[in-house]
Design a protein with these regions (language model features):
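Solvent-exposed loop/turn and edge beta-strand elements of beta-rich ligand-binding domains
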Residues: 1-193
Length: 193
């Protein structure tokens, strides 16, 4: 994502925006997980400021203590780390969310959104997997000339299937003189009458 403070010569302060999220296929074993019915929430974490020349994002006062600089999101790392930090406090921030479920193609759209910075977070993966939270700016400038108010994202989900681990304990003794290893068996338990 390019720098968020840009010349605002073509900027329209009254224009609403949208965020469309497309879930990527996630392999789980030999199959692809179901992208339908995944709950996705968005939170407006910053409003937009416009001084007639430039725009900037002003983080919500309830999130100021996080130290997140929403105007310094220029790389995926600078997006991912602040987004993860914000998810740890967002539920207690007083900021309300809008939550929707993905359609059968793994797509969900949030429309008629005020300009600002939004935190996107998966709330319930259903049987999909999971994706990392991320931040989306409305608007943003991709080519250095035109503002984009309708943002479309493609997530890279990962499987949330956990592997299994089997632990086998063995009681062994190694004779220090010969180096020979002996398998020992503990006595069988018995019941007292």
């Amino acid at each position: 994502m390019p720098a968020q403070i840009k010349a605002a010569d073509s900027y329209n302060k009254d224009k609403k925006g949208s965020i469309t999220i497309n879930l990527d296929d996630v392999k789980q074993g030999d199959s692809i997980t179901n992208k339908s019915g995944v709950s996705v929430s968005i939170y407006q974490v910053a409003s937009i400021g416009h001084d007639g020349v430039n725009i900037s994002f002003d983080i919500a006062s309830s999130l100021e203590s996080t130290g997140v600089d929403v105007n310094d999101i220029t790389t995926s790392d600078k997006n991912l780390n602040p987004a993860k930090k914000l998810t740890t406090v967002i539920d207690n921030s007083g900021i309300s969310s809008v939550t929707k479920k993905t359609d059968s193609n793994g797509k969900v759209s949030f429309t008629d959104l005020a300009q600002g910075m939004y935190l996107v977070e998966e709330k319930d993966s259903a049987s999909y997997g999971m994706f990392s939270p991320f931040l989306v700016a409305i608007p943003y400038m991709e080519d250095g000339q035109n503002w984009i108010y309708d943002v479309e994202t493609y997530t890279k989900g990962v499987s949330n299937q956990q592997g299994s681990l089997e632990v086998t304990k063995a009681l062994v003794y190694m004779d220090p003189e010969t180096g020979k290893i002996y398998n020992l068996q503990a006595p069988k338990s018995y019941e007292e009458n």
